[in-house]
């Protein structure tokens, strides 16, 4: 255990490393897991064996498979993530639909085995990334991604020559 770690009602497997500033409660961590620094496991999260939950990653009601890496700066809530998944920096599961009908409405994201998620992606739940799929960096995924498919969901870049100068002069 690193310094300034807070653990409450946790089950932690053998040879797991919990680094500085990590906060975890009412969750389960497998064997040989690396948590943190500054990871946050909210209640009802499960982390599989040989998995990395890195710095500034927050899990909420998330089940994470074995040999998976969520290395930094991500929010994974109301999600099931398979084994051998790599999730890039800045990934967010968008799980709340903004409506309150008989309480908050949360939706599930499912990421099956062997998926690669590039940096700065969002999963707008409910959505499933099927086995072996590849999510391109910068994508906002709103529909299911079929197995072994590449999903690219971002607008094409448009450069407007001279426009920056015009904007600066309007100040």
Say what each PLM segment does:
Residues 1-21:
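Phosphate-binding active sites in nucleotide-utilizing proteins
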Residues 17-171:
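Glycine-rich hexapeptide-repeat left-handed beta-helix
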């Amino acid at each position: 255990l690193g310094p300034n770690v807070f653990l409450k009602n946790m089950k932690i497997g053998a040879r797991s490393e919990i680094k500085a500033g990590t906060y975890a409660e009412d969750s389960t961590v497998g064997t040989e897991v690396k948590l943190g620094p500054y990871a946050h496991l909210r209640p009802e999260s499960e982390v599989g064996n040989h998995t990395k939950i890195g710095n500034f990653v927050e899990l909420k009601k998330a089940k994470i498979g074995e040999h998976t890496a969520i290395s930094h700066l991500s929010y994974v809530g109301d999600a099931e993530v398979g084994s051998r998944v790599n999730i890039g920096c800045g990934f967010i599961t968008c799980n709340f639909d903004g409506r309150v009908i008989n309480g908050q409405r949360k939706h599930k994201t499912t990421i099956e085995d062997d998926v690669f998620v590039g940096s700065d992606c969002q999963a707008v739940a409910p959505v499933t990334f099927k086995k072996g799929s590849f999510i391109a960096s910068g994508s906002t995924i709103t529909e299911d991604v079929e197995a072994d498919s590449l999903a690219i969901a971002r607008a094409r870049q448009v450069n407007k020559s001279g426009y920056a100068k015009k904007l600066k002069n309007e100040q």
